[in-house]
Structures are given as structure tokens and as C-alpha cells.
């Protein structure tokens, strides 16, 4: 059975949003594993490092970072785009370059914080 799993950190980030925004984001994030083979560049990005693949989904002003797992999809982070832009600015990276982002330790530390938390 396909599941969308939030870890503790991404669940906390999602629950901090107003209920209406939560529902809007979840409504937009309609995805199946086979969708990952044919990504829409308008909404999706792929970030890779050392054989690890992470996906980014753009939903309004938020970015959902997730990975494909045998169970389905695990959501690692749900971040407001301005927060993420601040991170990119501090890292001196161009905003649109997922490949450059995948090479920065700071980004992967941010994701690993979510991975280390328990599933919600």
C-alpha cells in the first residue's frame, strides 16, 4: 500500500501552518511513485548527492522535500520559500540550481535533521 509519511520534523512544520494552508498544500501534493519518472519541471526538482536522491515539490509559497521509499514517499521538510531563499542567499547559491544545492553540506544537514526524527 502506497503511503505518504511525514517524519516528526516535517509533521511539526506542517502543523505550524494554518489549517486552510495545510489542506491547500496537501491538495496540491497529489503524487504517485510513477509520477517521479516523469517530473513536471514547473513543480518538481531533483537534488542528488552520493547516490541519494531527494525531490522538491513547489506548492504555492512552500517547498516540500521528500524521498521515495519502499512504503511510498517520506516527507523530510516543509519550508516556506523565503526561509529557503534566505538559506540559499547565505550559501551564496543561485536560487534555481538544484545541482549546486545538492553539493552543499548545509542543505543536507537540514534534510538529515528531518530524517533523524521519528515518523509521525
Regions found by a protein language model. Name each.
Residues 1, 52-54, 70-72:
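A generic structural signal for beta-strand entry/edge sites
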Residues 1-28, 101-120:
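Arg/Lys-rich, positively charged N-terminal/basic patches that mediate binding to nucleic acids
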Residues 9, 31, 36-39, 71, ...:
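Short, functionally important structural connectors and interaction interfaces within domains
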Residues 19, 30-34, 80:
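Short, intrinsically disordered, mixed-charge
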Residues 24, 55-58, 63:
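Short, cationic motifs built from Arg/Lys/His that form the positively charged side of catalytic pockets
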Residues 31-58, 110:
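A short, surface-exposed loop/turn module that caps and links secondary-structure elements
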Residues 62-63, 67-120:
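Enriched for short, Lys/Arg-rich terminal
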Amino acid at each position: 500500500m502506497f503511503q505518504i509519511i511525514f517524519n516528526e520534523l516535517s509533521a511539526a512544520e506542517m502543523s505550524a501552518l494554518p489549517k486552510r494552508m495545510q489542506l491547500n498544500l496537501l491538495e496540491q501534493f497529489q503524487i504517485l511513485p510513477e509520477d517521479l519518472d516523469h517530473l513536471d519541471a514547473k513543480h518538481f526538482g531533483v537534488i542528488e548527492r552520493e547516490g541519494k536522491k531527494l525531490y522538491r515539490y513547489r506548492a504555492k509559497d512552500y517547498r516540500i522535500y521528500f524521498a521515495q521509499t519502499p512504503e511510498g514517499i517520506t516527507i523530510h521538510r516543509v519550508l516556506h520559500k523565503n526561509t529557503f531563499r534566505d538559506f540559499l542567499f547565505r550559501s551564496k547559491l543561485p536560487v534555481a540550481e538544484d545541482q549546486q544545492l545538492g553539493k552543499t553540506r548545509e542543505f543536507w544537514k537540514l534534510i538529515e535533521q528531518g530524517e533523524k526524527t521519528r515518523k509521525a
